[in-house]
Amino acid sequence: MSNTKESKQVIVIRKDLNMRKGKIAAQAAHASMGSILQLLDRRKYNLLEGEVMEIRGEIKVSSPECHWLDNSFTKICVSCDTEDELLALVQKAKDKGVLCCTIIDSGKTEFNGVPTLTCAAFGPAWAEDVDEITGNLKLL
């Protein structure tokens, strides 16, 4: 067993919304990209110059974000039952200091025009930190 730390991102999708497969894929992609944009903003990057080589030069080598960018971009999709459950996970991530990006769909193609919280991405962060938040959830 390796002592190397692993990084990952977990995307939690609300299953009570009964979204179509394509909608789920789009929402998960929004969440993953949103977390990267948050990371870039947090690190005060110029997005026009935010190529991976430049990002790697600015993020501490020991950070989970750098590990994630340099490795396999591990993403795992799991589900939760309700909006309240997702919001509780988001609060837990905030309390723990784990990067979290929530997605509120505009409602143009689903949800009868009502903006709706669909999912959240947790991380990239060290796997054990993300697991403390999402480890009990079932795979999507």
Q: What feature does the model see in each segment?
A:
Residues 1-140:
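Positively charged, small/polar-rich N-terminal and surface patches that mediate targeting and assembly
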